[in-house]
A protein has these predicted regions:
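Short hydrophobic beta-strand element within catalytic cores of glycosyltransferases
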Residues: 300-303, 314, 320-324, 333
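C-terminal amphipathic helix plus adjacent low-complexity
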Residues: 225, 335-444
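Nucleotide-activated donor-binding/catalytic signature segment of Leloir-type glycosyltransferases, i.e.
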Residues: 229-269, 275-276
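N-terminal pre-catalytic "stem/leader" segment of glycosyltransferase-like enzymes
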Residues: 1-81, 218, 402
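Conserved donor-binding/catalytic core segment of Leloir-type glycosyltransferases
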Residues: 5, 180-198, 204-207, 219-221
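Extended catalytic core of nucleotide-activated donor transferases of GT-like folds
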Residues: 5-7, 46-140
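Acidic donor-binding loop of glycosyltransferase active sites
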Residues: 268-286, 296-299
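Donor nucleotide-sugar binding/catalytic pocket of nucleotide-sugar-dependent glycosyltransferases
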Residues: 127-173, 418
């Protein structure tokens, strides 16, 4: 059995929180193979899951078990480490090392490259698990000129990288959300954090300008800035009102949703009878979980064809020509875009570099795409349902859990083989971090 320390925001209402719980579920599915310990972390100022359910109760029990172990005074040595594997679900510059095999789990970045700090920390792990090929490419294709003393070298990612996307979920609809009444006959939905990375104001402006005189069309915006607090709600409403004030004669409607919602409640938005399509003007996604949830729920999606979400918005093209293999068909309404440097307010030290680039949607293309989906809804819905069927099969939860399990086992076994080989070569191996620092050297 492999003793695993899972470190991440496992009780946070955030993308990384959901990522942590996905990894947790994957490992807990095989109790005969993985002995799971949990070290919870925060994710910024995001809200925590407060409602009790069987999963959160089990997570809390595993957290308590971990705390008891760490407070027991047990020593962490190479000969007998506390943990065989650590899985750290976070951004790479926060990776720490506390097991024999240390695996990073990250959503990557919205931009076209990762920072040198990310590469340095990633190379200290024994492997990386990312959620999309965009994230993988960001690590594998980014290089920097570096030096150590007089030695010059190319800094690049050298550890193996596995891609494991999220699984689909089957949740019972919320009767409370289904009872929400919208005055408009056709409604778009967008779910995201309000900030420069998600480019929400472009969604808002594009919608209003396209449907300015259409009283039967609405945009449902589920958003937050930092968390689900009342202060966040009212400060964000002021920002939305400032945008709306610039369109005093608009007839289209904006529905602003804010606050704690369960997973079932959120998923019910995607299947609500009065919600017809999902729209995003994101600058980029490591994966794009709300976009994925909308797609596997059968909603037509309007999005730029760039970054993590393209993994699941395309499907194999049906063709009778044998030579045309690996052709993919876009199953969403594509918005034209350009790749350009990130805005100064989006720069995040050690995470988003000032010279990074991401996508900017073309406003005219966004408006046209929304109009096309509304005017050709039957055909667009049929296409979305075809994609839905494909995603439900490809991203079945048991298949994705198995991929996490296989990746952890593979990376751990590869590392053990490397340790043995290094011992035979008289090379020191380190277990470093907050738990202990140890080294092994072959005796002569």
């Amino acid at each position: 059995m492999i003793r695993v320390l899972l470190k991440g925001p496992v009780l946070s209402k955030s993308g990384y929180g959901e990522h942590s719980r996905f990894v947790y579920r994957s490992l807990k599915q095989k109790p005969d193979k993985f002995d799971v310990f949990v070290y919870p972390t925060e994710w910024g100022k995001s809200s925590w899951i407060l409602n009790e359910n069987p999963e959160t109760n089990q997570i809390n029990l595993d957290i308590l078990r971990t705390r008891n172990l760490l407070e027991s005074g047990a020593q962490n040595t190479v000969e007998k480490p506390l943990f065989d594997v650590s899985l750290q679900v976070t951004i790479p510059n926060e990776f720490e090392f506390s097991a024999r095999t240390n695996i990073g789990v990250t959503a990557g970045i919205e931009t076209d490259r990762v920072s040198p700090e990310w590469i340095q920390k990633t190379n200290e792990t024994q492997g990386l698990i990312v959620v999309s090929h965009h994230a993988k490419n960001g690590f594998e294709k980014t290089t920097y000129d570096a030096s150590k003393g007089e030695e010059k070298f190319t800094l690049k990612t050298t550890v193996p990288i596995d891609v494991v996307g999220y699984p689909v979920k089957k949740l019972e609809p919320s009767s409370e959300v289904n009872s929400l009444a919208f005055d408009t006959k056709f409604n778009f939905l967008s779910i995201c954090q309000w900030g420069p990375r998600k480019n929400v104001t472009a969604t808002l402006r594009g919608f209003i300008e396209e449907f300015m005189d259409d009283a039967d069309t609405g945009l449902i915006l589920k958003t937050h800035r930092i968390n689900n607090s009342l202060s966040d709600r009212w400060s964000l409403k002021a920002d939305i009102d400032n945008v709306l004030a610039q369109y005093p004669n608009r007839k289209c409607k904006i529905y602003y949703l804010h606050g704690n919602m369960t997973e079932a409640e959120l998923h019910t938005l995607y299947t609500h009878s009065d919600i017809h399509a999902y729209v995003t003007t994101t600058h980029g996604e490591g994966y794009g979980l709300p976009i994925f949830e909308a797609a596997y729920s059968g909603l037509p999606v309007i999005a730029p064809s760039w970054s993590g979400h393209v993994d699941f918005l395309y499907m194999p093209r049906e063709t009778k020509t044998k030579n045309k293999k690996n052709l993919r068909e876009a199953m969403f309404e594509k918005v034209k875009y350009e790749i350009a440097q990130v805005a100064p307010e989006a720069v995040w030290e050690t995470v988003i570099n000032a010279d990074s680039q991401w996508c900017y949607v073309e406003p005219k293309s966004l408006k046209k795409s929304m109009r096309v989906v509304k005017q050709n809804y039957i055909a667009k819905k049929r296409k979305a349902e075809k994609l839905q069927k494909y995603l439900i099969e490809k991203y079945d939860c048991n298949k994705m859990y198995q991929k996490i399990q296989d990746s952890v086992v593979k990376l751990h076994e590869n590392n053990l083989s490397t340790i043995v080989a290094n011992l035979n070569k008289n090379v020191t191996h380190h277990v470093v971090g907050s738990l202990a620092t140890a080294s092994v050297r072959k005796e002569k």
